[in-house]
Amino acid sequence: LSGLAAGGIGTVVNVGADMASTKTTIALTEKYPFIYGAAGVHPSSTAELDEEKFAELRVLAQSGKIVAIGEIGLDYYWEEPDHETQKKWFHRQLNLARELKLPVIIHSRDAAKDTLDIMKEEHSEEIGGVIHCFSYGKEMAAEYLKMGFYLGIGGVLTFKNAKKLLEVAEMAPLD
């Protein structure tokens, strides 16, 4: 971490993926002045959530340097947790973001339609945020951009088979 500033990095947002990593994130934000955090439970970890843990997440998300709710969303690549469990906690975490007036960091893999449908149901355009590791096509990108979301496009863009993602990068605004 001490080498970040020398590398030109002034601020880090460390993102929680489950209850344990959200707690670790908060500890890092308290230790380092340049680290901020996102509190949330990744779709692949939603089976760990219940009402008690969600109440704890709500408290954690109100820690001083939490700047987003994430990483949240849907991931249908794996069979577990089941889709209904993921959807339930995606809805709940979107509502938590709205309640706390924080943007979201959305994860969506093999769940394009359901992710977009839930985001529209929850009026996520009022929340804002980023679709991280975006991997869908131009049509889906246009929907998210209309909602005011940023698209996080990673190194997959450099892969030879990333033609649809290259089209997205070409059509998306630079800001």
What is the meaning of each model-derived region?
Residues 1-175:
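Mid-domain alpha/beta scaffold segments of enzyme catalytic cores
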